[in-house]
Amino acid sequence: MNNQAKYILKAVFCTLFFLTLFGTTSAAAPPHVAVFSQQGFPYYGPLEQTSPRSIAADLEAAGLHADLLNVEALADPARFNSKLYAALVLPYGNTYPQRAFANLKAFHQVGGCFALSGVPFTHGVEVNSAGVWNDLGHKTETALFGPGGIGVGGFISGPHGRVQIAAGDPLGLNSLKLDWGRSDAIQILDIASLRSIDRIIPVLTAGGQADAALVTHPNGAFPISVDVWTMTSGSTDSDDLTRAYGAEQLMARGVVAALAQKGLLTSAQKTYALHQMDKQPRPVAYNNLTLPTPPHPYSTLQPKMTLPARHLYVSDVRKLDRDMQRLLFCLQGLVNRKQPRVFLISDDNDSFWLETMQKQGHLDAPIPVADPLTLLQTFRDVYKGVVVPDPNIYVSPEVAVDIAAADDLLLATPELAVKLNLPIKNDLRGRFRDDADALRFIRTDLLPRLNPYLGAVLAPQILGAQLDDIIAAKGICFWVTGPADSKKPGVDMLAETAELEALLAQMPLGAIVRGYPWAGDGSGLGERPGVALFSRFGKILTASDYVANYSVMSGFPLTHLAQKPQPPAPKLDPSKVYLSLVLSDGDNLSLWRGAARPLFTDPLHGTFPVGYGMGPSLIDVAPPMLEWYFSHMAPTDEFICDVSGAGYVYPSSWGKALKDQTGARRRFYHDWTQDYMARTDMKGLRVMEATEDDLAWVGVDTPQVAFQMPDYGYLGEDYAHLTYALPGGQPVFRAASFGPEARDLADQVRTRVGKSRPAFMNVFVSFWGADMSKLKKALDLLGPEYVAVTPSQLNTLYRESSRQKADK
């Protein structure tokens, strides 16, 4: 019997048993519940792993009838009304479907119940002609009572302190044994926004206030409506799957409690329903994990190839279709595994770097290959055939990449294999049930034959030029879908995430994850959830979804490279504001392939000081690129280590799933980050998603780092909390801006420095949209009271000012 049949039988049994609790009359049938579910609908507040389908399954297991309804159904009074449904679950947080608002209001006014998440009914969303959901902006009155409101209540900032289960435990949460975290950043129901006749039943509390609650709303001649507010996001010490599970349980159990409060369930029926929910599967919680320690195949964090041949086979693949290109990138990886001999041109950036490597003396004249497909014959001895992915399993191409790396195969469609007369050695069509099954195969069957120190999170649609290095180093390619991918074949985001966690638990500390966990709004894990997940398991993301020819570039040895000397800092003037303009996103190695070059050839380059965040692992993966940028530095330029050290991690999440989190922190910062910063002559460090406590322990673990410049943009602190020194003396310059527009930058700096003089400011500038003319204009707008300096000069001036104050 398959799992689906077992689930159906189980649901039928639960429903029949539930009917015996109700009695046998048709009037006593289990209540029907609607769960809002719409592909691509934006989450605002809750984690994107919060699954409408899982909530519906929990309700079905509890004996209720649950239907997934989209926007079209919710907006139709004939398909959604209080006669058909007793309650509606709204799992997307602050966002709601504007088109359905009038019908939702009518449902609520006649006694329909809501299970709410986030700050409900504050962000209406509409779909445009292109099928993209657009947030219409914040609007408070739609949640309130009155002519234009739906009548659920407003919100206020939440209290501080641990979240605890309320007296009486009306949702039976104690049985879950979850850590509900702290409410420091949570907004809660504003009791003052309710009517005097409304009643609050606390579910979770913090600081004496209801953090989650049942709210009964008498409706005059109509039955009461009972809403459940479930705004808490759970403990940040827990992984996202556990937090999403907690949110789902709050909403599903809240529905049961609301229906019981409304009189649609008896006490016995409520008890039974909650007991059934207790028995539902829950995600594995990874804590106190000890990671494996297999032998490391190279001495660096990033994979390194051997020294390339002086004469490379060079071919332009731009005129080939994507399937042919992908096949040749696989061939390139297999050829270059032993010694880099093939360089493929997929855009103008590749031509630039090929010419640059010749000018640098790394390469001699290439061997031109007019027809790229002739490389298949030239290097026929390095591959054994092809592997064919399954078009009915979305992540099947990732599995095919891994098989290609393990078994010396090329990735091809069946049609391409026939066209090129290549034998199909592994056909994945029909091999897997779904994405999760495919990811499980990677972990159980392929991981032992691949390089556990290298992963690659790459969406199927972008697999291409970045594959050469992954295949050459036998990396592990994978992808986990997001809510926008829900209709793609084989997709199950929660099951996929669980499989990914199991895979990460079997990879060593410091394993690199190439690629990027986001491929458009709602596609993939998302940047923040993805980085947090990798960080929890001690894995280092290296953003590199659009790179190429690393299997060639990484082969050139480079142990250390010095930055150009800077002039001395200006004389300290106590009436001035000293600022350092520092561009963002340099941890993204794709940026250095092409997007950053115009900054260094701009006529304004070198006419004023600028700092650039850079991922120091560029010294491993592409030494010729690092050489080019360092050689094009002006004395007024400085590179600092970009987020958040030797790679992209969140200090607040780093190693949380591990038994020895302290050791993992020290390994990443004291050992790897300091080493890579020394190799690239970087003095300053930018970390991201870090509290003041995080910055303090990072400072302890990085005694050789001169200063910190944290944050991805301004986080709302005043000047006293923007610029300060850690107990060990290491200065911290938190971001005071975002930019990149000139007037915005100037206004942000003036506002946030206040009247402090002298002052020292980290002027964060978003790389995306920035250019030298905007930076120059911002400085002109600020005027002579504001002095631009390099990051290291800012550090020197701040330390001098601190000494002078201490001497007084």
Annotated model-derived regions:
Residues 34-35, 43-128:
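Helical hinge/lid and interdomain linker segments adjacent to catalytic or ligand-binding clefts
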Residues 548-630:
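Active-site beta->alpha N-cap acidic-glycine motif
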Residues 29-37, 46, 53-61, 80, ...:
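Extracellular ligand-binding/catalytic regions of CAZymes and related secreted enzymes
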Residues 278-557:
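Preference for solvent-exposed, low-hydrophobicity sequence contexts
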Residues 11-23:
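Bacterial N-terminal signal peptides
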Residues 95-179:
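A glycine-rich, often tryptophan-bearing local segment used as a flexible ligand/cofactor-contacting loop or short
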Residues 224-227, 500, 504-509, 513-516, ...:
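Catalytic grooves of carbohydrate-active enzymes
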Residues 146-236:
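Catalytic beta-strand/loop cores that center a nucleophilic Ser/Cys/Thr
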